Amino acid sequence: MASLLDRYLRNISDKSQQNLASVAYLASLDHLLHAFPSIGQSIVQELKSQRSRLKMIASENFSSLSVQLAMGNLLTDKYCEGSPFKRFYSCCENVDAIEWECAETAKELFGAESAFVQPHSGADANLLAIMSIITQKIQSPAVQRLGYKTINDLPEQEYEALKAEMAQHKCLGPSLNSGGHLTHGTVRMNIMSKLMHCLPYEVNLDTELFDYDEIAKIAKEHKPTVLIAGYSSYSRRLNFATLKQIAEDCGAVLWVDMAHFAGLVAGGVFVGEENPMPYADIVTTTTHKTLRGPRGGLVLAKKEYANTLNKACPLMMGGPLPHVIAAKAIALKEAMTINFRKYAHKVVENARTLAEVFQRNGLRLLTGGTDNHMLIIDLTSLGVPGRIAEDMLTSVGIAVNRNTIPSDASGQWKTSGIRLGTPALTTLGMGSAEMEEVANIIVKVLRNITVRSNAESGSSKSEGELSEGIAQEARQRVADLLGRFPLYPEIDLETLV
């Protein structure tokens, strides 16, 4: 049987029309299918799977083939603990060049004073941010006050006392039910809650918006060392000038987690007081989601934190992933183009179109709409748990995720809502007309779900049903959309057996 690459080249005989990234990608698949068939087939099946669903999980996107190819090379074999030009290993000059370029690109793209590009994930970036703040604002002053040069010089008793003191400092962040993230410290199972005394702030239950006066009141009462702003399920923008003032009034460091909306900052959608960069002391982000890069994280900060961040090893990190840093650099360069700016604006336009259609059809959205890339549907009036809505939409080829809503009585497993996002569909080239169609499909599915409880195991094991007619119609409409907007159209899936 001819290889995937052979068939691709045969179908596109005009060399000027051949895509080098596709050639490289197909060649790598050919090798894996031959040398490690089970792994190769799983990759092919995942490609087929992602091509056969409308990806509407707000935290997911599609990276370019260039980004993917940058991760598949011998850079993965290089150990390079430390920071550029200050490594614990020799022969790192090429990795130094890549990491330096990546950091400089990040600084230029976001207008940051410093950039640390090594974190393996958003969670790692957040952990590094809080550890850097603790080191800079609590540990170092205490060590100096005690008359020592470094923390390693402290006698055991004084070291233990300092650790106890650090754990008493307060961190104020958004609760999980109000749209915050696990790593914002308000979930006790997460390590962040064990590093400081973490306190939550909530959205107003009537408006479902963050109440800055209430946040200021809590901050004034508790005087946190750190004020966290950001979200993973909140459909509006934040005013970072106001949040900065709240932080300054109580003497707190302002840390912004922009993992979800970094691409909207890079693309010039969030500007002025909606752009965290001029106001935050430290900003963390993932490089996937709206940035369309590889899975990874970044920490952007004021200059005073640069030295601490560059000592992430040994603070909390070991060896970085230079092959992923190379891919981050490519994604950041892609985000500096005019096409990316157009993309970022289209992401929000598409989300607003979805919201309009949902509301026109009687569905309730948290906060009454969206100003960013996501929206959350409150399913309470439909009597459909988020878990079942997720399952039923998945069954017709639409990937969303269940999501809690403020004061959610259903808990974090069942939930009373679902979260949807437009980054991936916008990457495929879909626009307002397609969003109308997608929203109408979702409305029809949600309104035709029948929930049946399992009497033996209780309501938590209830299941959803959808008539075959409704399901088949939805699948066909989804297939029609995906047929017009295929993932990686330069790769012919018919050749992927």
Swiss-Prot record:
List the residue(s) that the UniProt entry marks as the site Plays an important role in substrate specificity: 288
Gene Ontology CC terms: cytoplasm; cytosol
Q: Which organism is it from?
A: Chlamydia trachomatis serovar D (strain ATCC VR-885 / DSM 19411 / UW-3/Cx)
Q: What class of enzyme is it?
A: transferase
- Give the enzyme's EC designation: 2.1.2.1
Pathway in which this enzyme or protein is active: One-carbon metabolism; tetrahydrofolate interconversion; Amino-acid biosynthesis; glycine biosynthesis; glycine from L-serine: step 1/1
Name the keywords, alphabetized. Amino-acid biosynthesis, Cytoplasm, One-carbon metabolism, Pyridoxal phosphate, Transferase
Q: Which HAMAP family match?
A: SHMT
Pfam families cross-referenced by the UniProt entry: SHMT
Q: What is this protein called?
A: Serine hydroxymethyltransferase
